[in-house]
């Protein structure tokens, strides 16, 4: 149920009858304050200006044509021409019943789209580090949300699995006589990478051999391809352990590495030349873009092939967008890549559009994000100043959560404690990130993220168990409530019900904008409203059975909404804490 969409349609119809143009925007929003009702229509200002009349006068005319019978109990004009809408308690009660009768809590499925989501993108022969966390978990929240809404989502893990470094690594593996790279652990590979780079920089004969190996690898030599595959397999096996720990939905089947697009690159360069978009410049092949200027104010040159014949990331990204439209049949493509890559992506996509590889009707969206910072406001590092491995971060999260849970539950059995610590620790790391607006940098702070108060995973997980405890105390089977009516008489009942019925609206925003913090804020709001409702509207000691059962049903919808909402974020819930 999308009440905002329903009201928008009703207000829009009334505005048109009142003389507004057919494409008028009613600007129906959820009200920020309870005294302004549940929703507010703010579109009178802009439309009245076009019509040459006072906004309040237009609002009065709209009200005479606005039919909200059975939806709103009160509609009033506020200030210069805002229309405040107060939902009818009977309407709320009816839709709470409908939400409870549906596994999807009444959430409709929009027109199905094929959506490709590019996220995570670690590099081969390197262990995942904290820099991969944001893309991985924000991207996965988008995947879960869009899949829940019924879209066909294709996960694209754009792994860095190609380039000159592989000649260097294979040469070093050979030098060390590692006959079976498949048995090496990734930690060894990290060391190998450092050693290989050192030799590459210091030993010219080794560097020459590495360069020759790259040529053989790119030429498809079976021996070198086999060595390359081993490096990829070791890396992705290790990364899958991290994905499983993080409770993200990526698997080996989702790997679409840079190497996938290699066969397309010569054809793309040739086609861009044939279209007159790419030209030779100082031996390289370049696309000059009027949309981007260099320091001299001239069109910026984007190199797509170096003078030695090598290709660049831009060339791969052009091929990648083309493949996602032509082969994967994407209706929409989302990229969860940090904000520093924005201009690079925009330039690649400008070329893609000019070349006609992806039509304008298919959005290419850069859902960029900021950096994860330490308490000092600088990029998050180890005490020694090195990069923090993601596995080490998750180990620390688990250890801290284990201590926290044991402190609060000294008698809890070890296996139960471990399960709870995992849900709390991993949930805390993910939620701390997801609850922040992705476009900004955020401070990583263990104390804040593991707190049991505020907008944190432990608080949200506890809020869920608190609602469940009501049913344990009531000693009632939830299914026994199915025939009981919902009756809304108190303000706090109405406020909780109205917010619960905004679940679909919240999902719609997250799906459109790729902003999981909106879902976090919504769920935190629900938890707070339930707390006030629980305190002021007795459930188990209600004045009669009808009120008791009705309030139990509000509690039931609260629990289901919290669980489903947290699931779209990839945050695990527990039944006891």
UniProtKB/Swiss-Prot annotation:
Top-tier EC class: ligase
Native organism taxonomy: Bacteria, Pseudomonadati, Pseudomonadota, Gammaproteobacteria, Enterobacterales
GO-annotated molecular function: arginine-tRNA ligase activity; ATP binding
Protein name: Arginine--tRNA ligase
Motif window: 'HIGH' region: 122-132
Gene: argS
Cross-referenced PANTHER family: ARGININE--TRNA LIGASE, CYTOPLASMIC, ARGINYL-TRNA SYNTHETASE
Keywords: Aminoacyl-tRNA synthetase, ATP-binding, Cytoplasm, Ligase, Nucleotide-binding, Protein biosynthesis
Keyword flag Aminoacyl-tRNA synthetase: yes
Catalytic function, reaction form: tRNA(Arg) + L-arginine + ATP = L-arginyl-tRNA(Arg) + AMP + diphosphate
Origin species: Citrobacter koseri (strain ATCC BAA-895 / CDC 4225-83 / SGSC4696)
Its EC number(s): 6.1.1.19
One Pfam family named in its UniProt record: tRNA-synt_1d
Cellular component, GO annotation: cytoplasm
Gene Ontology BP annotations: arginyl-tRNA aminoacylation
Similarity section: Belongs to the class-I aminoacyl-tRNA synthetase family.
Oligomer status and interactors: Monomer.
TM region(s), chain numbering: none
Subcellular location field: Cytoplasm
């Amino acid at each position: 149920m999308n009440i905002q969409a329903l009201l928008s349609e009703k207000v829009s119809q009334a505005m048109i009858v009142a003389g507004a143009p057919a494409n008028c925007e009613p600007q129906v929003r959820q009200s920020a304050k309870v005294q302004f009702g549940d929703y507010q229509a703010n579109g009178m200002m802009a439309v009245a200006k076009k019509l040459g009349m006072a906004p309040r006068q237009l609002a009065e005319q709209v009200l005479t044509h606005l039919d909200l019978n059975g939806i709103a109990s009160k509609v009033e004009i506020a200030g210069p021409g805002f229309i405040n809408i107060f939902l009818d308690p009977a309407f709320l009660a009816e839709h709470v019943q409908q939400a409870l009768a549906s596994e999807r809590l009444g959430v409709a499925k929009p027109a199905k789209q094929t959506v490709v989501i590019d996220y995570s993108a670690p590099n081969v022969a390197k262990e995942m580090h904290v820099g991969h966390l944001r893309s991985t978990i924000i991207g996965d929240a988008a995947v879960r949300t869009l899949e829940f809404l019924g879209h066909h989502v294709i996960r694209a893990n754009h792994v860095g699995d190609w380039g000159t470094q592989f000649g260097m690594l294979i040469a070093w593996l050979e030098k060390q006589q590692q006959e079976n790279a498949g048995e090496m652990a990734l930690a060894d590979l990290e060391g190998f990478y450092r050693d290989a780079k050192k030799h590459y920089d210091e030993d010219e004969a080794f560097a020459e051999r590495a360069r020759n190996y790259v040529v053989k690898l790119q030429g498809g030599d079976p021996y070198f391809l086999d060595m390359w595959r081993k490096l990829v397999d070791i890396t992705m096996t290790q990364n899958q352990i991290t994905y499983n720990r993080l409770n993200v939905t990526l698997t080996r089947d989702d790997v679409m590495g840079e190497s996938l697009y290699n066969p397309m690159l010569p054809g793309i360069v040739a086609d861009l030349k044939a279209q007159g978009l790419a030209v030779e410049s100082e031996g390289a092949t370049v696309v000059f873009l009027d949309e981007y200027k260099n320091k001299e104010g001239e069109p910026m040159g984007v190199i797509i092939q170096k003078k030695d014949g090598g290709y660049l990331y831009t060339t791969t990204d052009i091929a990648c967008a083309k493949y996602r439209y032509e082969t994967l049949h994407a209706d929409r493509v989302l990229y969860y890549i940090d904000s520093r890559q924005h201009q690079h992506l925009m330039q690649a996509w400008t070329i893609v559009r000019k070349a006609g590889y992806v039509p304008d009707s298919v959005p290419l969206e850069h859902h960029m994000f900021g950096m994860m910072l330490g308490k000092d406001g600088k990029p998050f590092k180890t005490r020694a100043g090195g990069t923090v491995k993601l596995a080490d971060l998750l180990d620390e999260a688990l250890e801290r959560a284990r201590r926290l849970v044991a402190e609060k539950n000294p008698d809890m059995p070890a296996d139960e404690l471990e399960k709870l610590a995992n849900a709390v620790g991993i949930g805390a790391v993910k939620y701390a990130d997801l609850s922040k607006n992705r476009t900004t940098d955020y401070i990583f702070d263990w104390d804040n993220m593991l707190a049991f108060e505020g907008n944190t995973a432990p608080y949200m997980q506890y809020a869920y168990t608190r609602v469940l405890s009501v049913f344990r105390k009531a000693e009632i089977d939830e299914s026994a409530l199915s025939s009981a009516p919902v009756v809304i008489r108190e303000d706090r009942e109405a406020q909780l019900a109205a917010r619960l019925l905004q679940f679909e609206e919240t999902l719609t925003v997250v799906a459109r904008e790729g902003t999981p913090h909106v879902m976090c804020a919504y769920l935190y709001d629900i938890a707070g409203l339930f707390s006030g409702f629980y305190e002021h509207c007795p459930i188990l000691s209600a004045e009669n059975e009808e009120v008791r059962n009705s309030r139990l049903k509000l509690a039931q919808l609260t629990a289901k909404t919290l669980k489903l909402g947290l699931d779209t974020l990839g945050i695990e819930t527990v039944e006891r804490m």
